């Protein structure tokens, strides 16, 4: 029986889900808006909300807890420095999910998950490894 089982399995092992949501949370904090499937967005929302609450609490123990959940120190720094100050007066509800139609290949329901009052310029910034240094050296 499924009594008390509230989370979706998403056809993945527990380790895969944990790693996937850690990566998705880091991507959402980095870009402040990501496009994913609707069930993944609905599962990601409480994870990110709890991370923002950790950032608002501040302190070394909360920072270490966020690092253990997200495994990306740069995004934890942004979480504690930028997002915590942005949402210091908001009591929850830091993210929104907007339905975005259906994916062409498999007709999966897609959604945009983004931060409320997000920085529009953050989207697409600092994506991937820097390749300008290699071009300057050549």
Swiss-Prot record:
**Top-level taxon of the source organism:** Bacteria
Complex and partners? Part of the 50S ribosomal subunit. Contacts protein L32.
What is the gene name? rplQ
Sequence similarity: Belongs to the bacterial ribosomal protein bL17 family.
GO MF term list: structural constituent of ribosome
Keywords, A to Z, come to: Ribonucleoprotein, Ribosomal protein
Entry annotated with the keyword Ribonucleoprotein: yes
> What is this protein called in UniProt?
Large ribosomal subunit protein bL17
Q: Which SUPFAM superfamilies match?
A: Prokaryotic ribosomal protein L17
Matches recorded under PROSITE patterns: RIBOSOMAL_L17
Is the Phosphoprotein keyword given for this protein? no
Q: Which HAMAP family match?
A: Ribosomal_bL17 (MF_01368)
What is the source species?
Bradyrhizobium diazoefficiens (strain JCM 10833 / BCRC 13528 / IAM 13628 / NBRC 14792 / USDA 110)
């Amino acid at each position: 029986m499924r009594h008390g089982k509230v989370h979706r399995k998403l056809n993945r092992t527990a380790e895969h889900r944990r790693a996937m949501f850690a990566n998705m949370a880091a991507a959402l904090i980095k870009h402040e808006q990501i496009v994913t499937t609707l069930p993944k967005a609905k599962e990601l929302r409480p994870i990110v909300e709890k991370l923002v609450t950790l950032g608002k609490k501040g302190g070394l123990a909360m920072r270490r807890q966020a690092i253990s959940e997200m495994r990306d120190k740069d995004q934890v720094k942004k979480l504690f420095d930028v997002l915590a100050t942005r949402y210091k007066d908001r009591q929850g509800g830091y993210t929104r999910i907007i339905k975005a139609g259906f994916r062409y290949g498999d007709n999966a329901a897609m959604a945009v998950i983004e931060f409320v009052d997000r920085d529009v310029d953050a989207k697409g910034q600092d994506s991937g490894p820097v390749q300008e240094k290699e071009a300057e050296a050549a």
